[in-house]
A protein has these predicted regions:
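Generic structural signal for hydrophobic
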Residues: 10, 30-34, 63-67, 127, ...
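Short, structured segments at the rim of ligand-binding sites
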Residues: 156-615
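Single conserved hydrophobic/aromatic residue that forms the stacking wall/gate
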Residues: 2-12
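Short, structured coil segments at secondary-structure junctions
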Residues: 7, 37, 130-132, 221, ...
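Active-site glycine- and acidic-residue-rich loops that bind
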Residues: 19-22, 79-85, 113-117, 355-361, ...
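Short beta-strands and strand-loop turn motifs
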Residues: 1, 42-46, 71-75, 138, ...
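Catalytic alpha/beta core domains of metabolic enzymes, predominantly
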Residues: 21-160
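Ordered, amphipathic secondary-structure segments that act as subunit-interaction surfaces
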Residues: 13-27, 258, 266
């Protein structure tokens, strides 16, 4: 093993390391020699099977101290994020003076604690940010002595300040903002317009990488597209003229990929079973979409995938089963893809979705279908008393339906609005602004992230609503509102929320919780693994780097409010992580520097410009 220290280049050589299980006489001999030669004595504990309880870890650390350790080294094996977080809790206890209770500050040994295994790899870097004097790396990729080790070259790159070129903004003075259209709404509407023979108009159009990706897909299917200011005109070809499409490129969009996989099977059927390939680039190639593959196979479609879940997909033949059942626990997007394709089949289909998740987004799909003239029936079933989240939903979908052209106002994006709503609430709570007004929002949007308003209210913020100028939507239907958020003159308080159906809020909720008094609880961590990054890990690692007190236990994340500080953090090529870290940096005394912010263009290319404006 090589050492990589916080000082980059400082290597601790005068150390001797002995296991906690060593016989007492052996330990005494080594301890005596260490003192004689002026070496640090490291007393180590390793668990190669798992991670002990927190109480056990505390006991181990204290036992290491009683054995004379100048530095306590505790290395566990993490099988999940909860294991890794439990080991990292030792640094909180050390900072609070609770790890070595009763010992004077000068008598407290230093601590190196991290987790082995791929699930714990990030802790080898994070431990340096939390106070460890050094960590362990391998000389090269072929020289690793334990699972999850970084190479020395990788660690030095991660610790080098020159690799964090973007310095975030240091203040927030905005009082009003109009965010762009929802990519969730826009991508559904773009695909529906392609399936409708004739012209559809999509108003309030604002391009981002994911929406442009959908537009390019339907252009490749033969649709004619024109833009008139903020209105997108789509001349759809109709579902029956899609048979010539043999390759679909979805960019980095998980939603677009999942919406198109069932449609690709229909295209294959129209073309006599000829294969259709779906591929993408960037982060989407690292996302395991096994649930989409499994759903297609359940429907009778032949689908091959790299490593049984990774793009590219090769899809052959159409949906042959008239009764289809699969789990929606991991993603509602695959369900939405089926709901958009099943009406095109010759016969009626019954689709049963067990463990449905992100139900508001299913409602959004159903609203889109209704706007484009498609009908279906659904029935929700509950375990026990009716209410809450259904255990399954059964959709009865008539066949031989045709999409009809429609004019749609692409409503503003609540996911994007959440960053400004939280920034406005925190800034007003700190006395920096009077709050913020979100202009031209839809309150019955069915976008799950509208829940941010309820969360802010529970924190003690005031949320008020006023009608927006009717000219904002032109001749398109729908009422728009201006939403004002303020917490002037008061401290925000901790909140509890189940974010299972709105997992995209998790990163910005971590920012909000860090500025609330008390400990906030956010459920739904299990929904975070298959995003642009493993968001459970990235939220934990990057916000802890900025000083946040975060713990993850099972499906719940706990964030205790307290001051954040600046630091060098990584976006992990994840737009929501990048934007949330930038918002966090608005309220830190030192700058927050990021390695990359280009990923923000995926959903919100105007974010930095809107955030920088003072109006």
């Amino acid at each position: 093993d090589y050492y990589a220290s916080r000082g980059l280049g400082d290597v601790y050589k005068r150390q001797v390391d002995i296991e906690i299980e060593a016989p007492d006489e052996h330990l005494e001999y080594v301890r005596t020699l260490a003192r004689e030669y002026g070496c640090w004595l490291i007393v180590s504990f390793h668990d190669f099977e798992g991670t002990p309880s927190l109480d056990e870890l505390k006991g181990i650390a204290r036992l290491c101290r009683t054995k004379g350790a100048d530095l306590v080294k505790i290395v566990t094996t993490a099988w999940n994020i909860s294991d890794a977080a439990r080991t990292m809790r030792l640094y909180d206890l050390q900072a609070d003076g609770a790890l070595f209770e009763g010992a004077a500050a000068a008598e407290r040994p230093q601590l190196v604690a991290f987790s082995m295994g791929e699930a714990g790899k990030f802790t080898r870097l994070l431990c340096l940010k939390l106070g460890a004097p050094y960590t362990y790396v391998s000389a090269g990729a072929s020289n690793a002595t334990a699972s999850g080790q970084y190479t020395r070259e990788e660690m030095e790159r991660l610790l080098s300040a020159e690799n964090y070129p973007f310095e975030g903004f240091r203040e927030f003075r905005r009082t009003t903002v109009a965010v762009p259209c929802s990519k969730s709404v826009a991508q559904r509407a773009v695909l529906a317009a392609a399936l409708a023979a004739g012209e559809s108009r999509l108003a309030n159009y604002a391009p981002c990488n994911d929406i442009v990706g959908a537009v390019e897909v339907i252009r490749g299917m033969g649709c004619r597209i024109a833009s008139d200011g903020t209105t997108l005109h789509i001349e759809g070809v109709g579902a029956e003229r899609l048979g010539r499409c043999t390759k679909i490129e979805t960019g980095e969009s998980g939603l677009l990929t999942r919406l198109l996989t069932p449609l690709a099977s229909h295209i294959s059927a129209l073309n006599g079973g000829a294969p259709v390939e779906i591929s993408g680039h960037g982060s989407i190639l690292k996302r395991n979409l096994h649930e989409a593959v499994a759903a297609l196979r359940e429907a009778g479609v032949h689908c091959s995938a790299r490593e049984e879940g990774y793009l590219p997909f090769r899809i052959e033949g159409g949906i042959t089963r008239r009764e289809i059942s699969f789990s929606g626990r991991e993603s509602s997007q695959t369900v939405s893809g089926f709901l958009m394709t099943l009406p095109l089949l010759q016969d009626a289909t019954v689709l049963t979705v067990t463990e449905p998740s992100s139900i508001p987004y299913l409602e959004l799909t159903l609203r889109t279908l209704t706007r484009f003239g498609v009908r279906l029936n659904r029935e929700a079933f509950y375990d026990g008393v009716c209410g809450g989240t259904p255990s399954k939903i059964v959709f009865s979908v008539p066949g031989r339906q045709e999409y009809r052209p429609s004019d749609v106002f692409l409503e503003a994006d609540w996911s994007s609005a959440a960053y400004f709503a939280v920034a406005g609430a925190v800034a007003s709570s700190l006395g920096r602004t009077e709050g913020i007004t979100l202009r031209n929002m839809r309150l019955d949007s069915l976008q799950a992230d509208e829940k941010i308003l309820d969360i802010l209210r529970s924190c003690g913020a005031d949320v008020s609503v006023a009608p927006a100028d009717a000219s904002a939507r032109g001749d398109m239907p729908g009422d728009l509102q201006n939403i004002s958020v303020t917490a002037t003159g008061r401290r925000l308080k901790a909140f509890e929320v189940d974010a299972t159906h709105c997992p995209d809020l998790f990163p910005i909720l971590a920012v909000l919780a860090a500025h609330c008094d008390g400990t906030s609880r956010i459920a739904g961590v299990g929904r975070l693994t298959q995003k642009e990054s493993n968001r459970a890990e990235t939220i934990y690692a990057e916000f802890r780097t900025l000083g946040a007190r975060i713990d993850i236990r099972g499906d719940e994340m706990f964030v205790t409010g307290g001051p954040l500080h600046g630091g060098d953090v990584r976006s992990h090529n994840d737009h929501r992580i990048a934007m949330s870290l930038i918002v966090a940096g608005l309220f830190t005394p030192e700058p927050v520097r990021l390695d990359d912010v280009k990923c923000i263009d995926k959903s919100f290319p105007s974010f930095l410009d809107l955030l920088a404006r003072q109006e």
